[in-house]
Amino acid sequence: MAAARKTNTRKRRVKKNIESGIAHIRSTFNNTIVTITDVHGNALSWSSAGALGFKGSKKSTPFAAQMAAETAAKGSIEHGLKTLEVTVKGPGSGREAAIRALQAAGLEVTAIRDVTPVPHNGCRPPKRRRV
């Protein structure tokens, strides 16, 4: 009794024609994640330092953030994207490098917005590092 083999059928990405979108840059102390969406929030492309093969402390470098932004930008340009609003979240070192990489990839940045969450005296923060 042989089980029927399932062929490897993968859904092809549909090319959308979207002029403007939003780049969400999440820059933490450990990694940088860049997601490019349309104005409604539907993801067009994404990339991160970890997904590109950077490991450990190399993920948190500005160079890794730059490479992640370039990869995400190339994927969104395939969908016809030309202009971007940028939202930056987090305290990481890859914030500025990612924005510069998006501009260098040929996308026009119309606005940069910092949406880092700031507590109004909420949860107690973690203890200070002693190095």
Swiss-Prot record:
Protein family according to the UniProt entry: Belongs to the universal ribosomal protein uS11 family.
Stated name of the protein: Small ribosomal subunit protein uS11
Keyword Ribosomal protein in record: yes
GO MF annotation: an example: rRNA binding
Swiss-Prot/TrEMBL GO biological process terms: translation
Cysteines engaged in disulfide bonds, as pairs: none
One Pfam family from the record: Ribosomal_S11
Originating organism: Bacillus licheniformis (strain ATCC 14580 / DSM 13 / JCM 2505 / CCUG 7422 / NBRC 12200 / NCIMB 9375 / NCTC 10341 / NRRL NRS-1264 / Gibson 46)
PROSITE patterns: RIBOSOMAL_S11
Protein's job: Located on the platform of the 30S subunit, it bridges several disparate RNA helices of the 16S rRNA. Forms part of the Shine-Dalgarno cleft in the 70S ribosome.
GO CC aspect terms: ribonucleoprotein complex; ribosome
Entry-linked InterPro entries: Ribosomal_uS11, Ribosomal_uS11_bac-type, Ribosomal_uS11_CS, Ribosomal_uS11_sf
Gene assigned in the entry: rpsK
Keyword tags: Ribonucleoprotein, Ribosomal protein, RNA-binding, rRNA-binding
Assembly with partners or alone: Part of the 30S ribosomal subunit. Interacts with proteins S7 and S18. Binds to IF-3.
